[in-house]
């Protein structure tokens, strides 16, 4: 039945693709729509057609949970006026040519096929997006700055929400990380909102709140049994957790007595054939929570407002509900010159137990994770632990965005909170991205490199909060590109505070063929 459903979905999409292709002369589709995840119509043709359509294909190797698959994917995107819909339909074939059916056998799996549903664009009076979130910021970013739920995509797909309303005198912003976390045991999400008023045309005053109802949701638990996959020997089966669970059940079902089973398990453990670990030795997170929350206020004043040049100043204050730690920025300044560049900077100061931009672009990696104590025992560390370890400091944050005549685009941001401190503290951040747009070089369909490192003592090439990677596309024919995607993160598995050795580097490399039909 599952195979029939998959075949039916693919057939319908290909049929719809052919139907739209027959009318495609009335609409144009940009080759790269990664920025806003919607298909934008060419302005010369907007009056002729309010419908845009793109059918993309992805073919190649992909690694999920350490297993290699051949991927056959369809990625249709359609725009009806302001409504945008994007799907991500992947059929994964294992080494035996069999379909990975666990991607299709539950109702929640079909939600994963939605890449995004959107209305409008950021900055418009009403904007809405459900699904993959590229970069989400509340206000000026003291609490939530640049959060993305696509960090582990496509290995793990999150379905979030981004919504904003802007009127003449007031407005609001809402962000949610992943509605899928509401399913199963101990449901919770991370999210926040901001409301603001504009008493004068150039003045905006806002208030924000954001929180995580359970940081432990950052621990992957596929079978939802309360034992995270990293310590669960049977992550896809909630009947077993340890090897002793499995063999005890099998031996008892065979008719052996409890005493005989216990004796045999001890013999197997003594021989080193199975682990001595029992389920009771592990921590069950089914009913455990670790909450975080922040509130904040902000104000911004537009000093210059013209078609080609804008100048804003701003200030913000926020406080942790967990630790009472606080932070403020004043003054902050932002200069924008059309679409060519944007420069921003602010002075900032914080108390103990506070981190600026707590919910940031690497949050899903830091939210909760297992760390080795050095003797082979694993324990969980959350980002709240990092919050409690933060110390009072002051410093600055500065950044810029650049668009060089649509040939090269880039952005960079740096934060240093070490002013007035003789010792180094864990609060330096560095982010950068450089992209070469299409048609700049022959045969190059896309090229992008990025690097992110948050809240570290020293800027080093490799840390646990480092995310680096790149995408390079080789155009082999019209509408066809061979893409090489590198994504690298790091994990301090032995808990020594250093990243060393290949086992602490997590590298994901995929090669795929992308086609636009």
Residue ranges: model-predicted function:
Residues 131, 135-137, 156-158:
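Hydrophobic alpha-helical hairpins/lids featuring a short glycine-rich hinge
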Residues 117, 434, 503-517:
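Outer-membrane beta-barrel "beta-signal"
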Residues 23-73:
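Short glycine/proline- and aromatic-enriched beta-strand/turn motifs that initiate or cap beta-hairpins
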Residues 50-52, 67, 84, 109, ...:
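Signature for the C-terminal beta-barrel architecture of outer-membrane proteins
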Residues 85-116, 141-143:
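Surface-exposed loop and membrane-interface regions of Gram-negative outer-membrane beta-barrel proteins
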């Amino acid at each position: 039945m599952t195979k029939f459903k998959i075949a039916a979905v693919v057939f319908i999409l290909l049929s719809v693709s052919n139907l739209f292709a027959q009318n495609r002369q009335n609409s144009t589709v940009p080759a790269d729509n990664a920025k806003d995840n919607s298909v934008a119509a060419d302005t010369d043709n907007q009056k002729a057609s309010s419908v845009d359509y793109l059918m993309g294909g992805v073919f190649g190797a992909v690694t999920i949970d350490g297993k290699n698959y051949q991927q056959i994917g369809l990625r249709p995107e359609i725009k009806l006026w302001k409504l945008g819909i994007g799907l991500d339909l992947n059929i994964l074939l294992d080494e035996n040519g069999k379909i990975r059916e666990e991607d299709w056998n539950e109702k929640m799996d079909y939600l994963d096929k939605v890449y995004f549903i959107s209305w409008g664009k950021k900055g418009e009076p009403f904007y809405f997006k459900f699904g993959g979130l590229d970069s989400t910021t509340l206000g000026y970013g003291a609490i939530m700055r640049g959060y993305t739920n696509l960090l582990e995509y496509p290995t793990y797909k999150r379905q979030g929400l981004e919504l904003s309303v802007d009127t003449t005198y007031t407005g609001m912003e809402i962000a949610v990380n992943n509605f899928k976390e509401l399913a199963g045991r101990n449901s919770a999400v991370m999210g926040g909102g901001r409301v603001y008023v504009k008493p004068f045309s150039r003045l905006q005053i806002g208030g924000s709140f954001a929180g995580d109802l359970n940081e432990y949701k950052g621990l992957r638990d596929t079978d939802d049994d309360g034992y995270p996959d990293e310590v669960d020997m049977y992550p896809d089966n909630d009947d077993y957790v340890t090897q002793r669970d499995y063999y005890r059940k099998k031996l008892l079902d065979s008719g052996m007595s409890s005493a005989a089973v216990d004796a045999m398990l001890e013999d197997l453990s003594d021989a080193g054939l199975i682990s001595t670990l029992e389920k009771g030795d592990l921590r069950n997170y089914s009913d455990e929570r670790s909450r975080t929350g922040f509130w904040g206020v902000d104000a911004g004043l537009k000093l210059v407002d013209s078609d080609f040049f804008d100048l804003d100043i701003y200030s913000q204050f926020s406080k942790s509900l967990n630790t009472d730690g606080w932070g403020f920025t004043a003054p902050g300044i932002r200069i924008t010159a059309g679409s060519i560049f944007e420069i921003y900077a602010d002075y900032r100061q914080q108390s103990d137990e506070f981190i600026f931009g707590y919910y940031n672009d690497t949050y899903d990696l830091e939210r909760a994770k297992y760390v080795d104590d050095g003797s082979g025992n694993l324990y969980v560390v959350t980002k709240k632990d990092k919050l409690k370890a933060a110390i009072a400091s002051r410093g600055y944050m500065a950044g810029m965005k650049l668009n060089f005549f649509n040939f090269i685009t880039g952005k960079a941001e740096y934060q240093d909170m070490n002013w007035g401190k003789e010792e180094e503290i864990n609060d330096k951040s560095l982010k950068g991205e450089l992209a070469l747009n299409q048609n700049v070089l022959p045969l190059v369909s896309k090229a992008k490199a990025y690097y992110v490192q948050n809240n570290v003592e020293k800027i080093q090439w490799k840390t646990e909060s480092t995310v680096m990677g790149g995408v390079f596309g080789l155009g082999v024919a019209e509408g066809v590109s061979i893409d090489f995607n590198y994504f690298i993160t790091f994990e301090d598995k032995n808990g020594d505070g250093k990243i060393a050795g290949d086992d602490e580097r997590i590298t994901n490399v995929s090669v795929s063929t992308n086609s636009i039909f």
